[in-house]
């Protein structure tokens, strides 16, 4: 592999609540060190602009189009990322010259894998100018060009983490990493480092939309609202009978593929409780499409902080002989893992290593990806 690089990863997920930042040192294969991490929340007004951006993006037919508010939103989003990077570096006493590359995810506003169309707002050239650091961005597009779904991309990082955990005997295999973000996704690491990955269903997005619409708050903190309700079986079955869960061919999801319940379908508490169950049950049902039954689930993402989701996931997984662990039980950071992954992927991109595989996105062959925006004053190169 190449020399070890210091990379910063930037992630703004489907929950649209803020920017996660993390540092990773890697040669593109092994993870040499996981450094500091932090989160920077968006203010409510900017979150509303992002929601409007989702609506404006519905009319996009080509990746480069920016109808409605999207051009201004992309610039403002990028500048907020640049400010977050500067704050993060200052808070952690890191000089920009000591960072080799930034992996910039941007904000997904449209994802239509059936049309080979994915749009992440984020101006890599502007971010490189504002931070003085090389930026790798737009990492999903090349996968789609080669027949992939454009998601998930994190499995390459999960595989690197699993190698490290297996060496010290901390987990039983096969292991499945579960990321419960707005959408939940699974990464299966089997014998011989076989990697299979796909989206598993709604994560937090339906719960977030439900409680925001009916309680005026952005999310159900810790699952407190859900803990006061009961599972409405008819409503849960309506979601779990969706063809997505039974289809043999797995596909990536957009946050609009599942809609929250109608106002009259449930009380606030019962709705939150039922949707938490759907998240957990969707994970276990989707895992039945894997090559072998998981022995260990490692859970990361914001959903692991919802006690009701985790309780249901423990019960459902244990009924099938699997153990469920939060990332922190293995000295991993469940909040920053996606940002860490984007740092890792940026280094792999710089070394032209694969980001995606046939078993993760359905791409025709292992492919690299990402576009490089060099910091001002030089053409970026890796030596």
Curated annotation (Swiss-Prot):
- What family does this chain come from, according to its entry? Belongs to the anhydro-N-acetylmuramic acid kinase family.
Q: What class of enzyme is it?
A: transferase
Its protein name is: Anhydro-N-acetylmuramic acid kinase
Reactions catalysed: 1,6-anhydro-N-acetyl-beta-muramate + ATP + H2O = N-acetyl-D-muramate 6-phosphate + ADP + H(+)
What the entry lists under Pfam families is as follows: AnmK
Q: What pathway or pathways are given for this protein in its record?
A: Amino-sugar metabolism; 1,6-anhydro-N-acetylmuramate degradation; Cell wall biogenesis; peptidoglycan recycling
User: What SUPFAM superfamilies does the entry give?
Assistant: Actin-like ATPase domain
Q: Is the Calcium keyword given for this protein?
A: no
UniProt keyword annotations, A-Z: ATP-binding, Carbohydrate metabolism, Kinase, Nucleotide-binding, Transferase
Lineage, highest ranks first: Bacteria, Pseudomonadati, Pseudomonadota, Alphaproteobacteria, Hyphomicrobiales
């Amino acid at each position: 592999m190449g020399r070890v690089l210091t990379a910063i990863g930037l992630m703004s997920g489907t929950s649209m609540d803020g920017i996660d930042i993390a540092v990773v040192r890697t040669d593109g294969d092994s993870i040499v060190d996981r450094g500091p991490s932090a989160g920077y929340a968006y203010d409510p007004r900017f979150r509303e602009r992002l929601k409007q951006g989702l609506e404006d993006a519905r009319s996009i037919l080509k990746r480069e189009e920016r109808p409605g508010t999207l051009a201004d939103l992309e610039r403002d989003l990028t500048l907020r990322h640049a400010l977050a990077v500067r704050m993060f570096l200052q808070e952690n006493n890191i000089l920009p010259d000591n960072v080799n590359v930034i992996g910039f995810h941007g904000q997904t506003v449209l994802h239509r894998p059936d049309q080979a169309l994915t749009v992440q707002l984020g101006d890599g050239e502007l971010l490189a100018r504002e931070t003085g650091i090389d930026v790798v961005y737009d990492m999903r597009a090349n996968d789609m060009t080669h027949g992939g779904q454009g998601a998930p991309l994190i499995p390459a990082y999960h595989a690197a983490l699993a190698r490290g955990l297996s060496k010290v005997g901390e987990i039983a295999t096969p292991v499945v990493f579960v990321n419960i973000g707005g959408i939940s996704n699974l990464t299966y690491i089997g014998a011989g480092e076989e990697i299979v990955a796909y989206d598993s269903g709604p994560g937090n997005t339906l719960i977030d939309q439900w409680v925001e619409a009916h309680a005026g708050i952005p999310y159900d903190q810790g699952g407190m609202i859900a803990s006061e309700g009961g599972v409405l079986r008819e409503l849960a079955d309506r979601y779990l009978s969706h063809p997505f869960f039974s289809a043999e061919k797995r596909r990536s999801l957009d946050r609009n593929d599942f809609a929250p319940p109608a106002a009259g379908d449930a009380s606030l508490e019962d709705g939150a409780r039922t949707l938490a169950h759907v998240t957990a049950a969707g994970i276990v049902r989707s895992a039945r499409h894997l090559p072998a039954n998981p022995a260990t689930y490692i859970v990361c993402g914001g959903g692991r902080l919802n006690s009701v989701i985790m309780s249901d996931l423990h019960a459902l997984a244990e009924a099938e002989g699997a153990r469920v662990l939060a990332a922190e039980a293995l000295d991993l950071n469940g909040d920053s893992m996606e940002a860490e992954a984007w740092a890792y992927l940026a280094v792999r991109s710089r070394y032209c290593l694969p980001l995606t595989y046939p078993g993760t996105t359905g791409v025709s062959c292992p492919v690299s990806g990402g576009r490089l925006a060099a910091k001002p004053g030089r053409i970026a190169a890796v030596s």
